[in-house]
């Protein structure tokens, strides 16, 4: 997606391309950010064509064209009215309304967790259609996931940290004091021992104090929702870091040296493929940030076309499994077995 940020000295929005070449230049979408930091995303072909029709070639010579701010807002509102999204259960949402609701984690992981697909859903389907079916009704929350969630909150959404997390002044989760807190809250998702919390904050401090992290995330938005229809199915996503010209996902790891291997093991390539489609970006504009929980070292990983293509293949395989067991119901889950030969 092309990103244009309006400068204070600009009277209008200026694009660094001739009008005649605009459609090709903007084919992956355009995001326009005004001085008040309000952004206007034009992704659908109809919206981009509407922009093109109202753009003026610059008078100062070739190489640029411009459009008035009120025109941008008018086009945005009119084209967005037509965008609706239908979930797997048939519920239809206005896309803007849906994106706004996705900031609410209870909606994102609740209703959308059941009635929209995601990179996690595709990974589960590839591993086992039974695992996907179970994930719709039963939540699995390992200590690794809990720690990762805590680090994400503290690093990307620190305002939520104080309101969500409970720290019990014990070293172990098997203590009576910890169990009493879980009983009081009714769920352990945001309850941490002092030991767990302090270890996570060490990792967060190392990340936030890293000069490269500070530079790359300056002016970026965090935890930005995205939604689109891919191959006829609704897909949800959240960009951990939405920069001016890139998207990044933050991962935690216990061993940074093995991150490249783990990226394949945990199918991060599927996430890459889905995010590129949902947010309309090129794979070259996507990166993974990996923070080592033990050392505090930060790894930054770009991706290749091979990694993107691998994600596409897994994505298509996951959809095949989904259609077979949950749409066309060509086979019952109870008949699913894994066969092999030991030699």
Where are these regions (language model features)?
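A short beta-strand micro-motif
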Residues: 2-10, 32
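Glycine-centered tight beta-turn/hairpin loop motif at sheet-sheet or coil-to-beta transitions
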Residues: 8-10, 37, 234, 245
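Short, charged/polar micro-motifs that form catalytic or ligand-binding hotspots
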Residues: 16, 137-145, 261-266
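Mg2+/Mn2+-dependent nuclease catalytic core
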Residues: 18, 218-219, 224-313
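Intrinsically disordered, low-complexity segments enriched in glycine and mixed charged residues
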Residues: 20-22
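Acidic, low-complexity, intrinsically disordered interaction modules
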Residues: 27-77
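Metal-dependent nuclease catalytic regions and adjoining charged, substrate-binding loops involved
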Residues: 30-36, 47, 81-94, 261, ...
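Metal-dependent nuclease catalytic cores that hydrolyze phosphodiester bonds in DNA/RNA
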Residues: 79-236, 339-341
